[in-house]
Amino acid sequence: MTLSLANRRASLPVAYRLYLPNAWAEDDDRRAKAGVPEAITFKTKPQIALEQIRWACEVGLPGSMALVDAGYGHDSKLRAGITELGKRYVAGIQPQMLVWKPGKRPGRTPKKGQRDAPDTTSVKDLALGLRARAWRTIQWREGSNEWLSSRFARLRVHVASSHERACEPIQEWLLIEWPEGEKEPTKYWLSTLPSSITFRDLVDAAKLRWRIERDYQELKQEVGLGHYEGRGWRGFHHHATMCIAAYGFLVSERETIPPSGPRAAARLPQLAVPDSYRPRGSSIAT
């Protein structure tokens, strides 16, 4: 479980915690062997994610928007918690998430096991029913790579869930991606970014998660995050901390070098090699 800070130029994990399944959390023998602290109890991944975001707010880390992938974005309590912290979000969601149909507003809370089926729809069905003019081709970039493009639609919706119904309903963006050649839409997001945001800026925000995916890849390939073979709680977190520190150094160095850097790196003076110098291992080295 990680929390990263990201902008359009760089990103870096700032919180890292091993997820402990409920079976482990309740197994005293396993906990003792792995050295799991007594204070660590079972929590769902969305609960841990919200704790990490809350911690970042409490210590004053910068950031006005939370990006959440589809594995977490379905959790209404996580989204509400982010809003309560004064942050906006762009959250990936699953196609089956229910929203109120355009023009409909949340009404009475249905009895358990019942749904106001005529007034709600899945985001997938809503997307499939949109007219052709609702879709626009939008371009975005991922770092210094070439421009990417896909088809998107966006509209304002109210989410239909028991948690949202218990609170004051809010209208938010539903962003849908349906690439050319695909039989159906491939990605969906909910966002509390301002209603005035431009279409392209909304897409840019949703696509910024590529930096986090790159972090995972480089942490494993460049600094050995995946090399840990121990079984200890403290050992794993120590290993992860050292890997993140090393990765932070690489990120800072990368920022001084074009095209990532804002300007050309300062040229360092080339020092002359002493006449007496011989390469290590040379047959004439002294």
Model regions and ranges:
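An anionic, glycine-rich sequence signature occurring as long contiguous blocks
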Residues: A6-F42, V90-Q94, V99-R211, P279-G281
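Short, solvent-exposed helix-loop connector elements
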Residues: K77, T137, S191, F199-A206, ...
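Basic, amphipathic alpha-helical segments enriched in Lys/Arg and hydrophobic/aromatic residues
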Residues: V223-A285
